[in-house]
Curated annotation (Swiss-Prot):
Name of the featured protein: Proline dehydrogenase
Chain positions of site Critical for catalytic activity: Y278
Positions bound to FAD: M136, Q166, R187, M188, V189, K190, G191, A192, T229, H230, R292, I293, A294, E295
Source organism (scientific name): Deinococcus radiodurans (strain ATCC 13939 / DSM 20539 / JCM 16871 / CCUG 27074 / LMG 4051 / NBRC 15346 / NCIMB 9279 / VKM B-1422 / R1)
PANTHER family: PROLINE DEHYDROGENASE 1, MITOCHONDRIAL (PTHR13914:SF0), PROLINE OXIDASE (PTHR13914)
Pathway(s) annotated for this protein in UniProt: Amino-acid degradation; L-proline degradation into L-glutamate; L-glutamate from L-proline: step 1/2
Amino acid sequence: MIDQLYRKAVLTVAERPQVEQLARQKMWNLAERFVAGESIESAIQAVQALERDGIAGNLDLLGEFIDSPAKCTEFADDVIKLIEAAHAAGIKPYVSIKLSSVGQGKDENGEDLGLTNARRIIAKAKEYGGFICLDMEDHTRVDVTLEQFRTLVGEFGAEHVGTVLQSYLYRSLGDRASLDDLRPNIRMVKGAYLEPATVAYPDKADVDQNYRRLVFQHLKAGNYTNVATHDERIIDDVKRFVLAHGIGKDAFEFQMLYGIRRDLQKQLAAEGYRVRVYLPYGRDWYAYFSRRIAETPRNAAFVVQGMLKG
């Protein structure tokens, strides 16, 4: 409950226009710990640096609350440019997108614009042997996102498109089971949006326990699993689980956020585990940065210390 109250307080303050304006003026030097620059070039360089340490990248062009269909299509074009740039740099493209950013819920000639643009993006990634992860947003978009995910897996294959489930939502265990027929590649996260107790666990202990259930059930079902957490207790539990069940290191990977626990990322890679780092980049970094601060008081303390030094 305390964690939920903390998250709510931080995100409520972050939504104030004057706070966003101040942050954009004063906090980029702090945000760049969590964001891999504002350009494609800086993001590609960040992936290359990770790969030198045996760690893969998951690129994400930041852009939320895009309102017009034209801007959504322009955003999709920019994602395609990112995929092409990654391929040109010798990187197998692995990119996350929010379907809302490419037009989910907007009609174009009788079809969802988000689905249309996602098809273009995934087709380009598939051309280069790459992969697109459909990020999950707040609970109001879960149904349509999973429906569109099912459609896209049918068209492009589970080896080229995956999605995300959030352990703080009560419904996620059922959603996971409902997707088993697809043999889906799913990233398991705890969840960073502010959700009401009617749909999400308010207590961290319940979120953590549900996270373990999601990961263990997905692994036991024989599906590729992305264990996206920095929680060392959970990481150790996953290590023990796969060892006890004879699950190979090629059946899953650990995923972490750019700028957080780099030591742990390198340690896991050195132990022979697959490790991938989520690398957000772009000018629209504020909402993402706010959610990172809201995750833990430790991140907020980092920002306060940086402001005092600055």
